[in-house]
Amino acid sequence: DALRWTALHSSNALDICIKMVKEILLLRQYAHTNIKIIMATRNFELEDDVRLRNWISEINSDVKQMELKLFEPDQIKPYVSQFEDYDQLSNEQQNILKIPLWLGIYMDLANDLGCAPKFTTKLDLIKSFIDDRFEQLTDSHGISTANSENFFNEVINLMNQANKLSVSSTQLSIGSSEIKKAMISVGLLTEQNREISFRHQAIHDYAIGKKLYSQGLSSPEDFLHELGSKNQQTLLKREHLRYALAMLYEADERAFCNCIEAVLFHSEIRFHLKSLVFSTLRHIENFKAPLKKLINKIISDSDLAPHFIRLSCSGCPTLVQYLSENQYLSDWLDEDDEMQSKALELLSSVSDKAPNLLINELSKFVNRSPEWNQKIYNCL
């Protein structure tokens, strides 16, 4: 993971990992050496990278897979219950607080405010956190918002130029030591071995995402330019893109759609960024004309359509409903090939949430043949 997606990106990272693992397995087998290797990868890579998936399958007998899971409600409630009833939060809010990073930011804010922070999305939480810290810089340290913003942006720009999450304190402008100390005091920055970093990586991601958002409002071309070349499209950019798209959707749906289209249809954009775009689409509830037009274009593209169906539509009643209303599902069901199977899988994925969709689409196939009856039964 680190070899492949950090600023020190290596195109042959998987080859290096395969060679390392092979050598370790040989040591275990012939030298009886009790040595193990831990390899971290993200779910989307394990699912979408065919070569990685096949390699893991080949050495499956020597692999123990461990999934890093989210907090359970019983682990979260003792913290949140100090400020509000966790069970009364929306599903989206509860899911955000299951992630340790966001629960930590929530608690920091709640303790400072003396009450539960108002939020709907991660974007709300991190923006509130930064605003709260800037207020503390003014109230407790006498530092103006303008000076805080200038220093904050200086740190962000230095990190961005170096493609790193930290910056040497020797690179900071002369006379900034007091602001630096104040930002460490209020919990915006940390310093170790003269290296400055943000207390939460989400602060850095939000700041870069905001810049990407500004470029997206300007034009899709500026948006792509800010994402950078393939070498620069690290996993860090994934989080920046997530924030930028959330802000674009709130501000201007047409600009949001134009930027999504630019990312999906550009050959020089890495798939892990396109994968994020597909995941973003599944969380949109209301489709206006620009987004409907874009969805139709994606479905008509033979390369993008399978990923859209799997990553955006599967399990998403809103999108499956759209496919039904626009005759895509009925057309696919009338085909006798892979698309029919995909249509049935989509209907099955929303059978609990939208049973009427299954009735509308499958009623005409009841008793058409024993095979069709079995397919319908499987969907249910």
Model features per residue range: what roles?
Residues N43-D49, W55-S218, D222-K230:
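Extended hydrophobic
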Residues L25-R53:
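Sensor-1/coupling segment of RecA-like P-loop NTPase cores
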Residues D15-M20, F71, N147, L236:
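Soluble or luminal CAZymes and related metallo-dependent hydrolases
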Residues D1-A2:
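Walker B catalytic acidic pair
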Residues H32, S90, S168, I269-R270, ...:
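Generic structural signal for alpha-helix starts
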Residues W5-I35:
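Conserved Walker B catalytic segment
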Residues K164, Q192, K210-L380:
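Extended amphipathic alpha-helical scaffold segments
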